Structures are given as C-alpha cells and as structure tokens.
Amino acid sequence: MSDLLHKLNFKIADASPEYKQRRKIQMIRFFTASAVTIFASRFAYRATVSRQYIPTLFQGNHSPPLSYNFTTDAAVAVGTGTLLCGSVTGMTVFGLCWILDVSNIKEFGWRMKSMLGGWESEKKLSEAPMDEESSYIQDSLNDILDGKYDFENDTEEVAGELKTN
C-alpha cells in the first residue's frame, strides 16, 4: 500500500503509523455517523409514509378519520425530527474533525484559534501598553500575592475603630 502511495505521490505515504491510525479513526467516526444518518432518514421516511392519510374516493380530504391519534403523531414527529437533527449534527461534526485533523475539543480550540488569527491578536494585546488604573490593580494584586500586606493587623484596627464609633 505504501508503495502505491509513493508512486502516486501522496504525502501520507511518509506519515508515521500513529498519524495514519489517527486519521483512520477519524474516518471511521465520520462514516459511522453517516450510516446512522442514513438509517435515521429511512426510519423517518417510513414513519411519515405509514402515518400518511389517504382518503377513499368519496371521502373529503380535509377531515382525518375518527380513529386518528394526534398525540401519537406529534410524539413520532418530535422523535424522528430529534433523531435526524442529532445524526446530521454528528455527521457534520465528525466530518469537520476529519477535514481539520482534530481528535478532541482542546485540539479544536487550538485549530480555530490559529485559523481565526487568535495568536496574532493575543500577541498584539500583550504588547499593548497598559493604562494607569489597570497597572495599579495589577501591582496591588501582585503585592497581595507576595505577602506585602498584613491583613490580620488591618482587621484588628478596623474592629477597634468600629467599637469606638
């Protein structure tokens, strides 16, 4: 197989076995979600066709028969709609993960951040000058974390002032 890939000049021929296994798992997830979507759509189609009301020759088509149950019909419609929505969403997500070579949520965040220019924006923001109020707050927090303030004495002084008032 590798010889054929080298002959056809595919870059994946030089990839590591771990990378090939990772891509294979992504592909299997996508095709599994696609198969579930196909089965769900067939199920929804059959559920719709079986509930279809076809009047007889001299029956009006504006009034359904008396034995018709609207509650069951609504429940089946909600169930099949949810099933279709979930399966199509899964197929879309796994397809995008396969295309973008993403295996988990953290990788997806990194990939989106790099694609949307987040690294450059973060670098520009870190190089921007800090205003006076923000630097004062940052210095105060750093002093608190370094232990430059003694809060035990401050609370005793405040308690003494409250007793005198």
Curated annotation (Swiss-Prot):
Subcellular localization, as worded in the UniProt entry: Membrane
UniProt cross-references to InterPro entries, sorted A to Z: AIM11
Membrane topology: Multi-pass membrane protein
One cellular-component annotation, GO: membrane
Keyword list, A-Z: Membrane, Transmembrane, Transmembrane helix
Top-level taxon in the UniProt lineage: Eukaryota
Signal peptide positions (record): none
Family the UniProt entry places it in: Belongs to the AIM11 family.
Name of this protein: Altered inheritance of mitochondria protein 11
Lineage, broadest ranks: Eukaryota, Fungi, Dikarya, Ascomycota, Saccharomycotina
